[in-house]
């Protein structure tokens, strides 16, 4: 079967090759015989017999039927021909009053150019009418001379150069008739064409190359053309136009051949290179569907300060106009420079730092945002209170500033707290706060105070809280833990509240803690304490500043930069990769299950074969036992004491049966 397929394939391949070669030969043949369509029209006149029968021809050509036309005996005509009555043809005299329009005149000049172009060239080259007719006769008789193409000429020239010998018979001497001309009217193009020809008579269809003519030859050509109804300068101008048209046709033909050469599925790269080469010099304008920036406008009428502070772009990259200024901690210890920097940051954000907040409405958002604290941390909390007990969940994301080293950390904390409040209200507040720390250090404890505001008036109360942040990977570079007590005011209350916290922190900047607190006057809460929390107000003691400077780089080494946000293309790529992994795992699992199933089926078939072989052996053994019992009963009936010969036969048959039963073929 395979050999037949190979034979059929070889046959098809041979047919394809034959068709391709035949198409190439056909194309070459048509390329050889292809000519200019203007040269297809030919008028032939020759003597021929009208009547094939000789008797009828003689009768038709007898003087009875033939008569001279216009008295010329050399020109005989049939007397039944209608042209016999045209004995007088008057000369045509155009009317003097009829004027020809410029369009008609130009058309007539073009027609004269097409009619008498060959005659003008012959007059310019000094070729007589007999020579021209003889050349036409030679062309019709022998089918024209195939002039070698330019590629063949180049190949022949390369061969001549490689051999180092000039063939004298490759060119023919110039025509004697041209050499005997009294005036040097022959153009260089005509000389080259004459030298290339193998015949004595040059090719009549070769046109004059206009670019190689000098001014005298151009004037002579135009003068020769005026006798044939053309205006002065028409002939050379139309010759140049014809040459440009021929060049354009040649260029278009070359393009078509190049396109045909690049046809097919495997030539996409060549077609692309050809298209790029053609469009290389052009300037391409951007398409109409290119992306344009959307217009930005304010849909509502707002005050300028409110619209500028609250309208934000949705783009993730910050615009250069609203880029916030980054302030760095340069010193610790309550210097005037820090206060000036804080004041400048507050002024740049566009809000007064000491502006009192407006009283909140019940169940509405709390207005008034401190813009100077907005850059440090943002927290949103929603609290619901029913019958003096409220459960609130707040999720806060605090983004700390940059240190000098360029490292930053993001700390996310979620805290669930239950608080007990004296007043029943339902409030939802969003706050952005800024922590300021001051105070001294007392045997490892750090005290910090931060002014804060809350969405409603809450009586001053003292709370103690302990927070722990666990570190999964503890490093012993700075000691495993340190205790700090801090007195802080909650960031959104009008009346300050103090909280003392003992924090245990490691070297991890992102910590999550869950806390539940139930307090009337005291509350215990677990709150996240990031190790690299930046405090903008300077501490009272420089020892705390030194300790911060030492602990901050150690924490920054472990955290590293925040994870960049993925673009939609990267997310789609990641999703596709996950889907491919899942599909690969599923395919692998299916293949393993299929292999296990095949192994199980093979094991079952082997078990069935073993069971069948065991049954066959048991049946064979039972049959042999029955035969032996029958033989024993039969011989015991014949004689109780068997003869020695029988005993030998019996013992030998018994041995044979035992050897068969113990043969390895039946052993299991």
UniProtKB/Swiss-Prot annotation:
Its Gene Ontology cellular component terms are: nucleoplasm
Cite the post-translational modification comment.
Phosphorylated in vitro by CLK4.
- Which InterPro entries does this one have? SWAP (IPR040397), SWAP_N_domain (IPR019147)
- UniProt keyword terms in alphabetical order: Coiled coil, mRNA processing, mRNA splicing, Nucleus, Phosphoprotein
Q: What is this protein called?
A: CLK4-associating serine/arginine rich protein
What is stated as this protein's family in its record? Belongs to the splicing factor SR family.
- Region (Disordered) residue ranges read 173-232, 252-668
Q: Which residues form a coiled coil?
A: 579-641
Please list the residue ranges that the record marks as compositionally biased, kind Basic and acidic residues.
290-313, 436-446, 584-611, 619-635
Q: Which organism is it from?
A: Mus musculus
Q: What's a GO biological-process term for it?
A: mRNA processing
Is Nucleus given among the entry's keywords?
Answer: yes
Cite the record's Basic residues compositional bias ranges. Answer: 265-283, 396-435, 475-486, 653-668
């Amino acid at each position: 079967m395979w050999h037949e397929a190979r034979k059929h394939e070889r046959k098809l391949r041979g047919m394809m090759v034959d068709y391709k070669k035949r198409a190439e030969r056909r194309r070459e043949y048509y390329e050889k015989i292809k000519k200019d369509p203007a040269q297809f029209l030919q008028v032939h006149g020759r003597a021929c017999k009208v009547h094939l029968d000789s008797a009828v021809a003689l009768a038709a050509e007898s003087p009875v039927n033939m008569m001279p036309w216009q008295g010329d005996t050399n020109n005989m005509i049939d007397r039944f021909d209608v042209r016999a009555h045209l004995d007088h043809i008057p000369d045509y005299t155009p009317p003097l009053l009829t004027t020809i329009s410029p369009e008609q005149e130009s058309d007539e000049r073009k027609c004269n150019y097409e009619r008498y172009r060959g005659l003008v060239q012959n007059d310019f080259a000094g070729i007589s009418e007999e020579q021209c007719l003889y050349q036409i006769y030679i062309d019709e008789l022998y089918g024209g001379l195939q002039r070698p193409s330019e590629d063949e000429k180049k190949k022949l020239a390369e061969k001549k150069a490689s051999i180092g010998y000039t063939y004298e018979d490759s060119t023919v001497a110039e025509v004697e008739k041209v050499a005997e001309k009294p005036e040097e009217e022959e153009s260089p193009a005509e000389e080259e064409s004459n030298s290339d020809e193998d015949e004595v008579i040059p090719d009549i269809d070769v046109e004059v190359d206009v670019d190689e003519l000098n001014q005298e030859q151009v004037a002579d050509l135009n003068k020769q053309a005026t006798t044939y109804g053309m205006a002065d300068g028409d002939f050379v101008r139309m010759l140049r136009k014809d040459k440009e048209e021929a060049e354009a046709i040649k260029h278009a033909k070359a393009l078509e051949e190049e396109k045909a050469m690049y046809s097919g599925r495997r030539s996409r790269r060549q077609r692309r290179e050809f298209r790029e080469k053609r469009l290389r010099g052009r300037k391409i304008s951007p398409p109409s569907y290119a992306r344009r920036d959307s217009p930005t406008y304010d849909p509502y009428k707002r005050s300028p300060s409110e619209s500028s502070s609250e309208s934000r772009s949705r783009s993730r990259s910050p615009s250069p106009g609203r880029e916030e200024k980054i302030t760095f901690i340069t010193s610790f210890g309550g210097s005037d420079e820090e206060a000036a920097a804080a004041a400048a940051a507050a002024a740049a954000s566009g809000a007064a730092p000491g502006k009192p907040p407006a009283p909140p409405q019940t169940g509405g958002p709390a207005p008034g945002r401190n813009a100077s604290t907005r850059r440090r941390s943002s927290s949103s909390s929603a609290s619901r209170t029913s019958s003096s007990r409220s459960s609130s969940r707040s999720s806060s994301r605090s983004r700390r500033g940059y240190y000098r080293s360029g490292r930053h950390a993001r700390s996310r904390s979620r805290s669930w707290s239950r608080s007990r409040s004296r007043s029943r209200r339902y409030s939802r507040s969003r706050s952005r706060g800024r922590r300021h720390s001051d105070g001294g250090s007392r045997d490892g404890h750090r005290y910090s105070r931060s002014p804060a505001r809350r969405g409603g008036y809450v009586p001053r109360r003292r709370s103690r809280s302990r927070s722990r942040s666990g570190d999964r990977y503890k490093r012993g570079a700075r000691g495993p833990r340190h205790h700090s007590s801090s007195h802080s005011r909650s960031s959104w209350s009008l009346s300050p509240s103090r909280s003392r916290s003992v924090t245990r922190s490691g070297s991890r900047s992102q910590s999550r803690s869950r806390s539940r607190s139930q307090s009337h006057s005291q509350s215990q809460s677990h709150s996240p304490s990031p190790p690299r929390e930046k405090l903008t107000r300077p501490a009272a003691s420089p020892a705390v500043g030194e300790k911060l400077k030492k602990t901050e780089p150690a924490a920054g080494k472990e955290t590293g930069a925040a994870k960049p946000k993925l673009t939609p293309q990267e997310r789609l790529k990641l999703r596709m990769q996950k889907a491919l992994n899942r599909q690969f795992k599923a395919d692998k699992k299916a293949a393993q299950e299929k292999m296990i199933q095949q192994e199980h089926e093979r094991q079952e078939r082997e078990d069935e074969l073993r069971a069948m072989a065991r049954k066959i052996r048991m049946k064979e053994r039972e049959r042999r036992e029955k035969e032996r019992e029958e033989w024993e009963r039969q011989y015991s009936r014949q004689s109780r004491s068997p003869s020695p010969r029988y005993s030998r036969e019996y013992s030998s048959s018994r041995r044979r049966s035992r050897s068969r039963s113990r043969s390895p073929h039946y052993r299991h």
